[in-house]
């Protein structure tokens, strides 16, 4: 089977990382797999591209930024070149472009968004026109289904497939050659700099954590999606006198090492789809403090996981302090591994290809 994954931009973010992991898994399983994008590769994706190419996954990324017609032209060329049997379009904008072209292969729209894309009138109108051009719609969480049905209506083939994590990459066994962990109490948050990820609240809470645990430090890493928000985080760190204890950094590809070395993972998101970052933290065993939102509820009873109202600074502070004294834990992630997710995607691929030929 020839499988093409389409993303908006090759970057270190959830949808793109899942597409990369699926592509490599499927290629290793004997399929012929490519990954295409609508805009050029971000610098932070370089190491992931090396990994893709080392596993013989074809990368079809434009070398310059195009307007809407240019994006359609580029995508048409890439589809003709790759000749896919099925296209998985990851996120709403790539799914728009894939369905706007007369692509013979069935298109599967994968809803990754943490927010409701269809609150925007334009997106709602376009999706209503293109909805049936998708042979299937995959939602990564039940909230995505609710958003779609509420704004667009029912789709003939719609299902929830949770994201999955590569367990082998995040367990302690992956770091046996690293030696012992560093000993400084460390809290880490990894995610795009945007209001929905709520890094500002983590900085406020950490200001109080540092009063209880003077040796503690905070590491923030992620794609700078909102430069004004990133600047606000940096300014708050400086204003609170935390510059020597807080790192406000860009995206990192060595997430498993960061989780191995840190003591607590913070995730005060206001909304999520089905977060890859949250799954990676759970797989690593690190104590987790996260917001009590619906997509995280499945982990509420897991060891060393606290789901709280992270907008309550005092409660958030107390949870972080408590987590710094907790032990790492093994969590039951059956059904949430990369293999589980890849198997479900392959089942969808077989189903839509069969339907297209009958």
Feature-to-residue mapping (PLM):
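A conserved mid-protein helix/loop that constitutes part of the nucleotide-sugar donor-binding site
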Residues: 13-24, 185, 192-211, 218, ...
């Amino acid at each position: 089977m020839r499988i093409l994954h389409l993303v908006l931009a090759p970057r270190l973010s959830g949808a793109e990382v899942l597409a990369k992991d699926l592509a490599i898994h499927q290629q290793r399983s004997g399929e012929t797999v490519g990954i295409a994008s609508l805009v050029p590769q971000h610098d932070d994706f370089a190491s992931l591209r090396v990994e893709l190419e080392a596993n013989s996954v074809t990368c079809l990324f434009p070398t310059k930024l195009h307007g809407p017609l240019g994006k359609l032209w580029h995508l048409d060329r890439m589809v003709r070149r790759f000749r896919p049997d099925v296209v998985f379009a990851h996120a709403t904008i790539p799914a728009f472009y894939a369905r706007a072209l007369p692509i013979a292969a069935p298109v599967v729209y994968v809803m990754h968004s943490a927010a409701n894309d269809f609150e925007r009138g334009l997106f709602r109108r376009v999706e209503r026109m293109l909805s049936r051009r998708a042979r299937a719609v995959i939602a990564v969480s039940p909230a995505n289904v609710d958003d779609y049905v509420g704004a667009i209506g029912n789709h003939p083939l719609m299902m929830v497939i949770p994201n999955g994590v590569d367990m082998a990459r995040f367990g302690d066994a992956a770091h046996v050659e690293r030696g012992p962990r560093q000993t400084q109490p460390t809290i880490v948050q990894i995610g795009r700099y945007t209001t929905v990820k709520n890094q500002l609240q983590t900085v406020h809470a950490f200001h109080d954590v540092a009063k209880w645990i003077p040796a503690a430090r905070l590491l923030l890493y992620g794609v700078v999606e909102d430069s004004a928000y990133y600047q606000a985080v940096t300014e708050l760190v400086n204003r609170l006198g935390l510059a020597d204890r807080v790192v406000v950094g860009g995206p990192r590809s060595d997430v498993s090492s960061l989780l191995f070395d840190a003591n607590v993972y913070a995730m005060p998101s206001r909304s999520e789809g089905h977060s890859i970052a949250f799954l990676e933290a759970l797989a690593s065993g690190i104590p987790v403090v996260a917001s009590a939102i619906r997509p995280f509820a499945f982990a509420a009873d897991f060891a060393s996981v606290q789901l709280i109202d992270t907008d309550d600074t005092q409660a958030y502070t107390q949870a972080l302090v408590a987590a710094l004294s907790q032990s790492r834990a093994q969590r039951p992630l059956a059904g949430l591994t990369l293999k589980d997710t890849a198997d479900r995607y392959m089942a969808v691929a077989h189903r839509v290809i069969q339907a297209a030929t009958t």
